[in-house]
Every structure is written in structure tokens, then in C-alpha cells.
């Protein structure tokens, strides 16, 4: 994949070294106690290599990459103010993804996924 602008560009190759991961219940990811939800999957096992182009010159880079895809037919709940998301890739190949939706009443809605190196998933719903 590549893109370029006046002060920044990149040319990267991605290679999946593990399976797609479907969060929640086979990809159905609940977002509120009122029933908002989305379909959500990730490819957390990309190896990435390429070049960043900056005004100072090109920089060769390589490492791990994570791609998410998520879609929904409805907006978030009216009492949800924002969304915090993170992912961690551990040295043993395991991954952790988590998010919280901040709510006006302070009772934030959260969910997370533990991903084994083989791609098997354990989902943790709102606690």
C-alpha cells in the first residue's frame, strides 16, 4: 500500500502471518446496554516493511501492523461521549485489544479480546 502528499508519503508491503480475528460473538460486537452493536474484525498478524518519505529523507521501516474493520447500521447510544481503543502485541505472539465507550453517567461500557498466537480468541464483555 502507498500514499503520498506534499510532506509525507509511504510505500509499505503487508503480509498476513495469522488468521483474521472476529471480535465479540463471531464478529458481532456489542457497544451499549441499549443494544447498539457493530460487526468488527481485525487482522492483527501483519508483518510490515517499507519506506516512509519525509521532508528530511526516506526512512526504511519494518515491524508488526494491525488492521481493523468495523461497521454498524446505527450511531452510538445518545449517552456515549467518546471512544478509547488500544491494542498490545506481546513478545510471545499474543495480542490484547480493548475499548471503552465513555458515557455521561460515568458507567462506561467496555469490551476486550485476548488473542492467542494461533488466532484463537477469548472475548470479555462489559464488566
Residue ranges and their predicted role:
Residues 1-127:
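Structured soluble/peripheral alpha/beta segments that form catalytic or ligand/cofactor-binding pockets
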Amino acid at each position: 500500500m502507498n500514499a503520498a502528499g506534499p510532506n509525507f508519503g509511504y510505500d509499505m508491503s503487508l503480509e498476513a502471518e495469522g488468521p483474521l480475528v472476529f471480535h465479540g460473538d463471531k464478529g458481532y460486537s456489542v457497544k451499549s446496554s441499549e443494544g447498539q452493536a457493530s460487526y468488527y474484525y481485525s487482522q492483527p498478524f501483519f508483518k510490515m516493511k517499507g519506506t516512509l518519505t519525509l521532508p528530511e529523507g526516506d526512512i526504511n521501516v519494518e515491524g508488526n501492523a494491525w488492521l481493523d474493520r468495523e461497521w454498524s447500521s446505527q450511531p452510538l447510544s445518545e449517552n456515549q461521549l467518546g471512544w478509547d481503543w488500544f491494542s498490545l502485541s506481546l513478545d510471545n505472539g499474543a495480542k490484547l485489544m480493548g475499548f471503552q465507550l465513555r458515557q455521561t453517567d460515568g458507567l462506561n461500557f467496555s469490551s476486550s479480546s485476548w488473542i492467542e498466537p494461533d488466532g484463537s480468541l477469548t472475548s470479555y464483555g462489559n464488566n
